Amino acid sequence: MQRTVVVGMGHIGHRHARAYTECEQAQLVAVCDRVEELARAAGEKFGVPYFTSAKECYAAMQPDVVSITTGGYEYSSDHYEPTMQAFEAGCNVLGEKPISNDLRHATEMVETAARLGLCYGIDMNHRFTPAARQAKKWQDDGRIGSLLFCNMALWIGKFMPLDSVYYHLKALNPHSVNIMQYFCGPIKEVSTFAMKAPGRDIYSTQSTAMRFENGAVGHLTSSYDIKRGHPMERCEVAGTDGRFVFEDMWREATLYPAETYVKEVYTNPIFDGFESFYDTFRDRIHAFVRQVDAGCKPEEIDGSGREGLEASRVIHAMIRSVEEGGAVVQVKDITE
């Protein structure tokens, strides 16, 4: 049984806390937020002690697993301090995405976890679904063959004022980039163009061409300008033996074998299937707890801190490309 704590009791923090209360291998023992009103309300809701200091919470409650769901500038600047404090206290950490808006902080967190032998995961919940696993199984079973290309699209409507001109790239695309690398491996180079939709002061829509280290090519479109009534996510992966399309996280995955006109389809079932976006959080959080509880090695963590770091590195390469007028940027050259 893993003793768990959630630090950062906003909307996402409540989802993490709820998921821990529903996990057979976890016990939620405390919540924490530096805003006392939020901490107290969450403590009362979940029936656990509350704290306003993460460091004091770790010392008092001795958790095994800590969720870091704080926000900050560009939705991630407040991840670093409570994460490092958790590692210093000997805790395994599941952090929200993006891992950090500062690649130097992200690198330090990943390296600290590795040095201390602690498990570090990032909430890449968009691919923690039965549909994504089915698509991956088709690939692992050789149904796709040698990789050719990957096309990814992710968009939601987010029209409020945001922190920075690159907020959309940094906050949304850890999901899309991680999905592409999950199926196709590390991204080698990118070329990105971005635009500010009418009335907006941020780069709210972008288009990226890329090459993977294995030679396959890809494309990513993302936007904060599409209203929420539309389907929001689509990943297409093609190879020499077949192609699959993985849609809306949990809704459907379709395999198109190269040598037949008959396709295979996984459709989320009405009974016992995913019912809402929350289910992706529950699946991802429970997967992390199960791995920690089973004694998995840090390098075996699915959706690891290193994956989060490499997704953000790609995004920072995309940003540099935008700044350089769409120039091709080598991902390995990006360190901050």
What positions do the PLM features span?
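Beta-loop-alpha module in the N-terminal Rossmann-like domain of NAD(P)-dependent dehydrogenases
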Residues: Y50-T112
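N-terminal Rossmann-like dinucleotide-binding module
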Residues: M1-F46, V289
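A short helix->loop->beta-strand "cap" motif at the edges of active sites that frequently abuts
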Residues: V48, A89-C91, L116-L118, G215-V217
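Hydrophobic residues in well-ordered beta-strands that form the structural core
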Residues: T52, G95, Y120-I122, F246
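A contiguous active-site-proximal alpha/beta segment in oxidoreductase catalytic domains
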Residues: I99-M160
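Mid-domain beta-loop-alpha active-site segment that forms a flexible
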Residues: D123-P130, L154-S191, Y203-S204, E307
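Contiguous beta-strand/loop segments that form the cofactor/metal-binding neighborhood of enzyme cores
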Residues: A171, H175-E252, T280-K297, E336
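C-terminal helix-rich "cap/oligomerization" subdomain common to oxidoreductases
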Residues: H11, K45, V65-T70, T107, ...
